[in-house]
A protein has these predicted regions:
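Conserved NTPase motor "head" modules and their coupling/switch loops across ABC/AAA+ ATPases, GTPases
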Residues: 1-11, 20, 267-295
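Short, solvent-exposed segments of well-ordered alpha helices
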Residues: 103-106, 110, 233, 255-258
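Extended, charged coiled-coil "arm/hinge" scaffolds of SMC/Rad50-like chromosome-maintenance ATPases
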Residues: 222-251, 258
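Structured, charged N-terminal subsegments at the starts of enzyme catalytic cores
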Residues: 172-228
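Conserved amphipathic alpha-helical "coupling/scaffold" segments
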Residues: 1-176, 180-185
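Amphipathic alpha-helix face/heptad-repeat signature
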Residues: 111-115, 242, 260, 264-267
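Intracellular alpha-helical coupling/juxtamembrane segments of multi-pass membrane proteins
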Residues: 253, 257-268, 274-275
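Charged/polar positions within long, soluble alpha-helices
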Residues: 124-131, 191-198, 226, 273-276, ...
Length: 295
């Protein structure tokens, strides 16, 4: 849905193979010192920067692309830091959701709707951030910003929010209108199925018979009373199949959003690390500590 391509201009992160014997190389180059300066005590940035630095870049196009991105990040660190914060908080919400274990499909769908609403909020935060004055100055981010705006339009956000609201009402006990077959030979046209226990009409008192007639003909003309156990079971299975299908739709949505925010956190995190390293080197230079290292 939304592609992140901030490390490779034509690929997602992770396409390149790692160097051979990465642990030995990291030790020989003393990368841990550089990585700590990049991470600023953020373990995720430490891990992501280590992962990126140990994957070689050989083609000239990617090298120029990375140079532009790093230059942007060093010049406008606050812009990249805010993007990283948005992605990190969104991933924290996703981890809260995935840590919950329940077999109840209604609960799963309800929680999926809640998470979608939260992620929609973070997508809007990101869109507003990409409209800021800082975004205008970050030239290397232009392609990403343009593509994101093309995919995440205001209409898309409104449609998704409206769909979430409609499904939330349904999960809280709203009515689902069906046009389908309930059982062999029984067709429903725009009807709501009510799972009611079978009753013997002849044993009802006059008041109950009147109440039943009002229910069927006045109060709920769309209702079909399932007075046979086989029909009830068919309706239950149909409802369960509908929930399973709905669950799969939301699972796919959530997977795409999770992949987007995960890649955004990893890739923007690398440039935040570069900005942190640039600050550290600048501070060392101001303190005249780098002059001692000059030949």
């Amino acid at each position: 849905m939304f592609e992140v391509a901030l490390l490779y201009p034509d690929k997602q992160q992770g396409a390149a193979k790692r160097y051979g014997m990465p642990q030995d190389m990291s030790k020989d180059l003393n990368l841990s010192v550089i990585l700590r300066a990049m991470a600023k005590e953020d373990e995720e940035i430490f891990t992501n920067c280590q992962r990126v630095l140990l994957c070689p870049v050989t083609d000239e196009k990617t090298l120029h692309f990375r140079q532009q991105m790093v230059s942007d990040a060093v010049s406008h660190p606050e812009f990249y830091e805010e993007m990283y914060r948005i992605a990190k908080e969104a991933m924290q919400e996703i981890h809260k959701y995935t840590s919950k274990k329940t077999s109840n499909k209604v609960v799963q769908i309800t929680e999926s709707l809640d998470l979608l609403r939260i992620l929609l909020k973070y997508l809007r935060y990101l869109k507003e951030h990409l409209r800021s004055e800082q975004a205008e100055k970050a030239d290397a981010m232009y392609l990403f910003t343009t593509k994101f705006r093309e995919h995440f339009t205001d209409d898309f956000a409104k449609d998704l929010e409206r769909h979430i609201d409609d499904m939330a009402v349904l999960m809280q006990g709203g009515r689902l209108i069906l046009t389908a077959g309930v059982a062999g030979g029984l067709k429903c046209g725009d009807a709501m199925v009510n799972r009611l226990d079978p009753v013997d009409y002849r044993k009802m008192g006059k008041f109950r018979r009147t109440l039943r007639w009002l229910l069927l003909h006045l109060a709920s003309p769309e209702a079909i009373l399932l007075n046979q156990e086989a029909l009830k079971q068919d309706a239950i299975r149909m409802e369960e199949n509908g929930l399973l299908y709905t669950q799969e739709i939301y699972r796919e949505f959530l997977y795409q959003f999770q992949e987007f925010f995960s890649q955004l956190q990893i890739q923007v995190g690398f440039y935040v690390g570069c900005a942190n390293l640039g600050r550290s080197l600048h501070n060392l230079k101001n303190e005249n500590m780098l002059s001692a290292c000059e030949p």
